Amino acid sequence: MKKVLLYILITISFAVSAQEKDKTLPKANEEYAEKKFVDAEANYRISHSKFPKRTVAPFNLGNAIYKQNQAGEAKFAYAKALENTKSRVQRHKVFHNLGNVFMQEKNYTNAVDAYKNALRNKPTDE
């Protein structure tokens, strides 16, 4: 009986810790919506450090950095988002934004490649 009770307690503790909620990401999203890109960037970085396997924080981090006219820095955040992305829709968004970064840098060859990759992940995009 003691072993069963111990097993149940251990299982519950793992389930609770595995479902830790990211409280920083919604705050960062609010700041981004309010055009507080520096604050949003900081909170996206915190969110990504707490949950490094998730895609949303590095993708949104790239967007916040891009809005601050730091395209070169945004590339690194988008690259990190690509590492964790499994969804074709999300990969499309990341590649599209990478294409925008390369266009801003006047790196047209890489921009075309990024846009092609975006279309490969979502062929119906116009």
Named regions from a protein language model:
Residues 22-23, 56, 90-93:
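Start-of-helix register in tetratricopeptide repeats
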Residues 47, 81-84, 118:
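Canonical positions in the second alpha-helix
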Residues 52, 86-89, 123:
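Short coil turns that delineate tetratricopeptide repeat
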